[in-house]
């Protein structure tokens, strides 16, 4: 410390007004760890911030989900299989902007810009051909609305005689993030909220 006051050297204050203690321990008390540790939120409870199951990741480790972003459904299908062969444990499909917006590939400004173009049910059949979705979880971020992609995946699985209830994974959407990112939505926000609530 070289003669400097302990409080000025050991306690760091950020410009937001947060003071960092020099060390945090379980015995520090309410002035430190009690403020930063969650008290009412555990895995499988509350807002599920710490996981959807009580055991968290103890029983099932985190998945390895390399994003597959080939433009054509057949190429993306081959890449999905390749990633599983190379150690991925989750099918992770990235769709292009036009697909996320529900625009036909023929009318798209930049088809395949960030992922696979899926316009029709046949495209989804090609994309999911030979994938063991009852064994390996499936992941897709669908932009503002997941309803269309969810319907296409479910229809494809049913057509192949698969039990949709045995499929694990997520076809997610985040209309707020899309609104912030692009400044507009292709559907009313209220409709998207209702869709997510169902």
Question: What residue ranges belong to the model's regions?
Answer:
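Catalytic alpha/beta active-site cores
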Residues: 1-198
């Amino acid at each position: 410390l070289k003669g400097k006051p302990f409080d000025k050297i050991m306690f760091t204050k950020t410009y937001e007004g947060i003071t960092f203690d020099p060390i945090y321990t379980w015995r520090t008390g309410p002035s430190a760890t009690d403020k930063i540790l969650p008290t009412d939120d555990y895995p499988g409870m509350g807002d599920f911030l710490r996981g959807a199951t009580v055991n968290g990741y103890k029983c099932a480790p985190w998945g390895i989900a390399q994003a597959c972003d080939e433009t054509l459904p057949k190429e993306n299908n081959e890449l999905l299989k390749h990633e599983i062969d190379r150690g991925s444990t989750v099918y992770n499909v990235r769709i292009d902007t036009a697909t996320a917006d529900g625009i036909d590939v023929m009318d798209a400004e930049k088809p395949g810009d960030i992922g696979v173009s899926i316009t029709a049910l046949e495209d989804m059949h090609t994309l999911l051909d030979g994938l063991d979705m009852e064994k390996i979880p499936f992941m897709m971020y669908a932009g503002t609305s997941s309803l269309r992609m969810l319907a296409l995946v479910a229809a494809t699985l049913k057509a192949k005689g698969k039990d949709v209830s045995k499929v694990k994974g997520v076809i997610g959407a985040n209309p707020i993030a899309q609104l912030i990112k692009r400044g507009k939505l292709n559907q009313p926000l209220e409709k998207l909220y209702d869709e997510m609530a169902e």
